Regions:
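A short loop-to-beta-strand structural motif that recurs across blades of beta-propeller domains
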Residues: 66-68, 108-110, 152-154, 194-196, ...
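A short beta-strand motif characteristic of beta-propeller blades
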Residues: 34-38, 78-81, 120-125, 162-167, ...
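Beta-rich, blade/repeat-based domains predominating
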Residues: 41-53, 84-95, 127-140, 171-182, ...
Length: 329
């Protein structure tokens, strides 16, 4: 592992002196944040969101077993049944305009064509123990890679429909997963406290250990330079690993005991994080190393994942059954 600079080491350890040098900017200006209640007859268990190709937003309804579709133009919500026993966690947009979903209840990766709304499950191989499917991403070849918190990663070869599963290092924990602009696949382990690159030929994981022990890496996202940004649940840090140099950097959001859940990098290479202790969103500027805070008008919103499109940051409020957008343009 590369030697950390004094600044990087202090950041990784979450030193209070460093945190004090990273002040907040003003709260979000009126009009930049807009929220809607989902308006469904019962709780959906909204978990993850993803931009749909027609300007709407998909979300996983983990409690009710649906793919949700929210239309911000009308404010209406549609629920699409995914199958018996469904309990979807993650959703991403595919290059085929379809929604790709990790469905722990069905032990399957599910594709929903759009706008046809045709549902097709890709079941994990027979005999696979319960995987607790979490999140998925598409690699540079158009195949779907996924994580299972029970201790697996896997792939759906989209052209053939073949599904394969690999054991992850250190057992349970695989959670967030992402793809770099070069097409490489990285994931993180919440229980294992590491990130890893997947060898796309063998399916094996190459572990990269962070400098902060037991940091609880929950979500990962790549920026345009292929650097991996990590939300650390246990340490509260926002960290970044540069695969080209092997170096790590880390920053602590404002507050005494932050709980950083999700991370997303927008089109301007600004990382966004959801911070549960503050019930707030933060946008981080890597140049100035400052956090900008965005507050919610509701308590305990519980943002578990972040996604977006140009000029829009979309947020699923698991705690309140709302969906929110922060407009940046």
């Amino acid at each position: 592992m590369n030697t950390l600079s004094r600044r990087e080491m202090l950041a990784a350890l979450g030193a209070g002196a460093l945190a004090a040098t990273l002040p907040m900017r003003a709260f979000a200006q009126p009009g930049r944040m807009q929220s809607w209640p989902l308006g469904t007859s019962s709780r959906t268990g909204i978990h993850d969101v993803a931009p749909a190709p027609d300007g709407g937003v998909w979300f996983t309804a983990q409690r009710s077993g649906h793919l949700g579709y929210f239309d911000p133009r009308s404010g209406k919500t549609e629920l699409i049944p995914l199958g018996k026993g469904s309990s979807p966690h993650g959703v991403i947009p595919g290059p085929d305009n379809a929604a790709w979903i990790t469905d722990g209840g069905q032990q399957a990766i599910v594709r929903v064509s759009w706008p046809q709304r045709e549902v097709r499950p890709y079941a994990l191989p027979k005999g696979t123990p319960y995987a607790n499917l979490n999140t998925c991403t598409l690699d540079g070849d158009g195949d779907v890679w996924f994580t299972g918190q029970s201790g697996v990663t896997g792939r759906v070869e989209v052209k053939s429909g073949k599904v394969s599963v690999n054991d992850a290092p250190r057992g349970r924990g695989p959670y967030g997963i992402c793809t770099t602009p070069a097409g490489d696949v990285w994931y993180c382990s919440l229980a294992g406290s590491f990130i890893a690159r997947i060898d796309r030929k063998s399916g094996e994981s190459i572990v990269v250990a962070p400098p902060t022990p037991d940091q609880g890496a929950r979500r990962v996202w790549s920026d345009s330079r292929g650097r991996i940004w990590v939300s650390e649940w246990n340490s509260g840090n926002l960290s970044m690993h540069d695969p080209k140099t092997g170096k790590w950097s880390a920053w602590k959001p404002p507050g005494t005991a932050p709980r950083t859940y999700a991370v997303y990098v927008d089109e301007s290479d600004h990382p966004w994080i959801s911070e549960w202790a503050a019930n707030a969103m933060y946008r981080f500027d890597p140049g100035s190393e400052k956090f900008e805070r965005f507050d919610f008008p509701r308590e305990q919103v519980a943002i578990r994942q972040i996604h977006g499109r140009r000029g829009e940051i979309w947020l699923p409020e698991s705690g309140t059954e709302h969906i929110t957008v922060i407009r940046t343009a």
